[in-house]
Amino acid sequence: MSRLLEESLKTCPIVKRGEYHYFIHPISDGVPLVKPELLRDVSTRVIKMIDTDIDKIVTAEAMGIPIVTAVSIATDIPYVIMRKREYLLEGEIPVHQETGYSKGELYLNGINKGDKVVILDDVISTGGTLVAIINALKRAGADIKDVLCIIDRGNGQNVVEEKTGYKVKTLVKIEVVDGKVQILE
């Protein structure tokens, strides 16, 4: 199996804001450069880990979009983006989102009762975004088959499982130590 994701994480820049150390990576930030081979590696690994007998893939804007696009093209499964702005479409479901660094609303459109879905996102840290997505999908009557985040940083997996009952799959678990990304698993 390719390890492009892990190798690229080991060398990504770290930026300190206050007391928090942010890792800056193409998958989580879209900078400095998203290379096709990295996106291909990630999307191929995702496809092997998720239930593909589904109707739709769901992500929240913004950095889940390149990943779901690549997975959608490879699998012919359409995707839905939970947006940060309201569209006022019939059936739109608003849900409050709180992460470690922001609060706001997300809006779900394009999901019908009984739709089989996979949730896919770039990073899980606090779990706030995934809890919001899961809550919106439950309100819509969707059948959530899998939840997967590319990068796990923090305790978000436990938070999501405690609050929703869903286990979150990840490709890689990291932490930032002494200004560098450490791969944990």
Curated annotation (Swiss-Prot):
Keywords: Cytoplasm, Glycosyltransferase, Purine salvage, Transferase
Highest taxon listed in the record's lineage: Archaea
Coiled-coil region list: none
E.C. number: 2.4.2.8
Alphabetical list of SUPFAM superfamilies matching this protein: PRTase-like (SSF53271)
GO terms for biological process, alphabetical: IMP salvage; purine ribonucleoside salvage
Annotated family: Belongs to the purine/pyrimidine phosphoribosyltransferase family. Archaeal HPRT subfamily.
Main function: Catalyzes a salvage reaction resulting in the formation of IMP that is energically less costly than de novo synthesis.
Stated name of the protein: Hypoxanthine/guanine phosphoribosyltransferase
